[in-house]
């Protein structure tokens, strides 16, 4: 029987104490505090300032049970983003679930890099859109641009469409598998992709919660060629980009120089590699 089963009401302060005690063997104090404030704001409408101002606020039995169910999910290493079912980046809320990858900080950095460089409206293609994060951010912050977004999965594309609709952002979605021989029927000024780039042999080094809960198809590369997505995207972009068009890619730190070589072989120019906030070479851009 849970320690919360017999409790009808409790204060926020006591709830926080029980929350912390339930998770201290799994996470640091700072991580636990972050998780607690995310949950009470999302489910109870109580933010950190509210907590500080009124720690003796009474929580109902219903909400105690709700938070307890989330504690159990956290103990099983379920990512908090999947627990609450959404993330927010650059003032855009995105629905996320087990079918789409949880956006990483370096992907937001990639978007910021593109926005900084792209000063005028253009025609954009996001290959492997997932939740639609890159497509929606670029559409919102590069004013007047036309954005297309592809993914091979109808299930994933449905989530991206929901995110676009919820945020009132117009994106042209299409089911396309870039690993197939895709014909060039349209031209773009800018193509961007954050494709799968982790080799399955590296799975043992990946965080348990990622391996257990996030979609492997968005992370790991099937087969023996861990650069296959880059090869296909670069080959397609070579023909699909307008003159002086730009390709942006997020990359594995250990394979970014291989990607650079593929770009050179395909006659891309002005190749630039960018580090993320941690000093890791994670992004690359090139012009055709």
Segments and roles (model prediction):
Residues 18, 38, 66-69, 109, ...:
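Alpha-helical elements of Rossmann-like donor-binding domains used by nucleotide-donor carbohydrate transfer enzymes
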Residues 54, 68-142, 147-159, 285:
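SAM-dependent Rossmann-like transferase core, predominantly class I methyltransferases
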Residues 55, 97-98, 194, 251:
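A secondary-structure boundary/capping signal
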Residues 60-65, 117-122, 143-144, 180-186, ...:
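Short, glycine- and charge-enriched coil/turn segments that flank and shape catalytic ligand pockets
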Residues 63, 103-106, 229:
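An acidic site on a long C-lobe helix of protein kinase domains
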Residues 145, 150-288:
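S-adenosylmethionine
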